[in-house]
């Protein structure tokens, strides 16, 4: 599936193309499929937003890091999956059919696609309504409002974990090496598998 502005339809010249494979699959198969499809993988990293989030494999398909594929390295919690629905998400068949999805921007603007474009409205103060419209829990909407308004106030605080994955290394090998020395990551993965 793709998520964000491509799914919502509010794209511009600076829009990223973000693809998510929502289930835990072997990343070597994903890399092989991308390369056989003519894509070049410019960089790879393991990222984890917080100690309680699933670690994810990120594959960047261009030097500017505007096109990426993400694969969870352990099963997502429901709130983590709702994160993508909050921003808007569509499947490949929906993308091919030019279907767009409602979703919210990082500036906390709800984008509702229309036949002629889209309608924009604020999220803050309408969390219950936005959750209902997007088919997500109020918990994810309030979490995103909290995180994104905090980001506006104090700036980005960064990721909990970022591990580069070199050519010739698999995500799974690098993750296992880190698990062996990181008790917090080990606990997170033990609770998911």
Positions of predicted regions on the chain:
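Catalytic core of pol beta-like nucleotidyltransferases
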Residues: 2-13, 23-193
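Short active-site oxyanion
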Residues: 16-18
